[in-house]
Amino acid sequence: MVFVTGATGFIGAHLLYYLISGGNEILALKRSSSNLQYVKNVFRYHTRDWETLFNRINWTDGDVTDYDSLLEATQGIDEVFHGAAMVSFDPGDMYKMLNTNIRGTANVVNAALENGVRKLAYISSVAALDPVKENQIITEKFFGNFPQRYSNYAESKFKSELEVWRGTEEGLNAVVVNPSIVLGPCIPMEGSGSFFK
């Protein structure tokens, strides 16, 4: 079974569709206040049989900042796709965002380790990477110090990646992807979609 956090977001909703379409059994985390209409719209975009596929998703209420709910949700899970994160460039959201993103990722990593999850895929951000020189190739070994001039969001993603790498040192099989601006069908008008307002 595959566990997905951030399932109600842009990347997460499309990921859910592709995982379900591939025959995977899914457990998706959502907040009790989440509106699933956006996820349904993404499924509707991809297929006429959207409702059948959507109804195959097992949903669980929880929050990445609640370790106990994650520990329970990851029991019997083989793979985790962790995409839940708060995105904000409002300085007033700094502490909430740092807590949600860093502590939330630490909780996901710890629950995965505790329950013997086979693999974790963490959806980070290009914001977490050091600046690169023109035409420089970035590999898995490219990891430097966090440049302080970046945003609080970048800091939260960088420090979240540190939690994932800590997990790998403790035996977790994990990968990190660092998307930049993510565009595609059904894009909401927040996050990358805000560029189109």
Give the ranges of each region predicted by the language model:
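NAD(P)H-binding glycine-rich loop region in Rossmannoid oxidoreductase-like domains
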Residues: R44, R48-T100
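Glycine-rich phosphate-binding loop and adjoining beta1-alpha1-beta2 segment
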Residues: K30-T52
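NAD(P)-dependent short-chain dehydrogenase/reductase
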Residues: T168-K197
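Conserved sequence/active-site signature of Rossmann-fold short-chain dehydrogenase/reductase
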Residues: T65, A128, V182-G184
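Active-site Tyr-X1-5-Lys
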Residues: R149-V175
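N-terminal Rossmann NAD(P)H-binding glycine-rich loop of SDR-like oxidoreductase domains
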Residues: V2-N24
